[in-house]
């Protein structure tokens, strides 16, 4: 029987088998021997021990499409990054940091600016324009007024989505609205998942529709690009791609070099200055990390 791990805790994996519900499974010793750790999001094969009690053994981890390090998760289709338009004001450097991390892992990102009811249309248009011009999908929502929820639901359908964003942006409100239509068979599932005194510091997938899962990411603000060379950073800015190879110097990193096509595009307003300034700041940060390494 196949399913997806939606939570792992204290040696148990909770596996969602679409038609049959959630099974509490123990990972067999062979995984420890092979040093293969089951992750939330893993598609797995289980053997059922007790159908009534919904218990079983994990017998195989199916091949992974991808694997995130922080949070530890597998088979992520996309990321939904949520910031508020106001209260708190968006931290664009933090947003760009997250986008780079996802670009590095080839996971497409959708940007959601929540609390749109707190800003004027002109300001919303500016925010929208910055990231649309880089090729990202951008949503403007209001959890308070339940605006844009059906649009998010459509984008999430049939996918496993990592949800990220700093605190206070309305992440929980949006997640609750998305879960509203799913009864969650509340009693049994939540009883099974809440066994033991554990908080949600553990990665967990929330079911928001058939084969549709959301994963919250704790520790968002401490995020940074791990294991990246400074020369690699430019490849994680989609808006730089069309200028690659058009600079005077081969291997131009678009920081101090003369006759740089990217810097020229910034001057001409084709690349947003704020995005470029964040790029330079990250480049210098990686340069410092490199110095400390050697």
Predicted features along the sequence, with ranges:
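Short, structured beta-strand/loop micro-motifs enriched in basic residues and often containing a Trp
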Residues: 21-30
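Phosphate-binding glycine-rich loops and their immediate beta-loop-alpha structural context
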Residues: 86-135
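SH3/SH3-like beta-barrel fold
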Residues: 13-17, 25, 46
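Canonical P-loop GTPase G-domain recognition
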Residues: 117-169
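Helix-rich effector regions associated with P-loop NTPase G domains
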Residues: 11, 29, 35-52, 62-78, ...
């Amino acid at each position: 029987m196949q399913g997806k791990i939606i939570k792992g805790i204290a040696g148990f994996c909770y596996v969602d088998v679409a038609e049959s519900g959630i099974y509490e499974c123990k990972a067999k010793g062979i995984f420890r021997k092979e040093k293969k750790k089951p992750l939330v999001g893993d598609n797995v094969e289980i053997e059922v021990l007790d159908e009534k009690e919904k218990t079983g053994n994990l017998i195989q981890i199916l091949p992974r499409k991808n694997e995130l390090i922080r949070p530890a998760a597998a088979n992520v289709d996309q990321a939904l990054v949520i910031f508020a338009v106001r209260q708190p004001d968006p931290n664009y450097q933090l947003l760009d940091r997250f986008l780079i991390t996802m670009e590095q892992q080839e996971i497409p990102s959708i940007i959601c600016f929540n609390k749109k009811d707190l800003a004027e249309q002109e300001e919303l248009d500016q925010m929208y324009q910055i990231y649309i011009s880089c090729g990202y999908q951008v949503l403007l929502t209001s959890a308070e007024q339940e605006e844009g929820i059906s649009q998010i639901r459509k984008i999430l359908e049939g996918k496993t989505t990592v949800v990220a964003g700093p605190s206070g942006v309305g992440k929980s409100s949006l997640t609750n609205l998305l879960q509203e239509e799913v009864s969650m068979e509340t009693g049994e599932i939540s009883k099974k998942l809440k066994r033991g005194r554990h908080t949600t510091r553990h990665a967990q997938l929330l079911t928001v529709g058939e084969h549709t899962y959301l994963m919250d990411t704790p520790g968002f603000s401490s995020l940074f690009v791990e294991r990246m060379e400074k020369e690699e950073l430019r490849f994680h800015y989609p808006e730089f791609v069309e200028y690659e190879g058009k600079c005077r110097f081969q291997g131009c990193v678009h920081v101090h070099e003369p006759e740089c096509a990217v810097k020229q595009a910034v001057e001409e307003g084709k690349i947003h200055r704020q995005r470029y300034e964040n790029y330079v700041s990250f480049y210098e940060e990686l340069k410092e990390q490199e110095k400390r390494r050697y």
